[in-house]
Amino acid sequence: MTPWFLYLIRTADNKLYTGITTDVERRYQQHQSGKGAKALRGKGELTLAFSAPVGDRSLALRAEYRVKQLTKRQKERLVAEGAGFAELLSSLQTPEIKSD
């Protein structure tokens, strides 16, 4: 099973883009060359701000969704310190209990 990664890319205007991939370097190069997400095209210089392995694709999708819900301040803490990332992953791996 190929591991999936969550990554954040910083744009020239200091915005953070969140995505998932199986190959961070390849995906970053795609974004740099304008062949990645439309949201990053024409945004100037891009820098890889954060990346971390998250497991399988299902978990990666849930982690991406959760990170996209964070405030800019929380994302900046994640980039600077990895703050809360382990807890975020742990919460996503906990099986959900459905009530009848």
Curated annotation (Swiss-Prot):
Q: Which residues form a coiled coil?
A: none
Spell out the Gene3D superfamilies in the cross-references.
GIY-YIG endonuclease
Could you tell me which CDD domains the record lists for this protein? GIY-YIG_UPF0213
Which InterPro entries does this UniProt record tie to the protein? GIY-YIG_endonuc, GIY-YIG_endonuc_sf, UPF0213_domain, UPF0213_GIY-YIG_endonuc
| UniProt-listed PROSITE patterns | GIY_YIG (PS50164)
Q: Where is the GIY-YIG domain?
A: 2-77
Q: Which Pfam families match?
A: GIY-YIG
Which cysteines share a disulfide bond? none
Q: Which family does it belong to?
A: Belongs to the UPF0213 family.
What's the protein called, per UniProt? UPF0213 protein YhbQ
Species of origin: Shigella boydii serotype 18 (strain CDC 3083-94 / BS512)
In the UniProt record, the gene name given for this protein reads: yhbQ
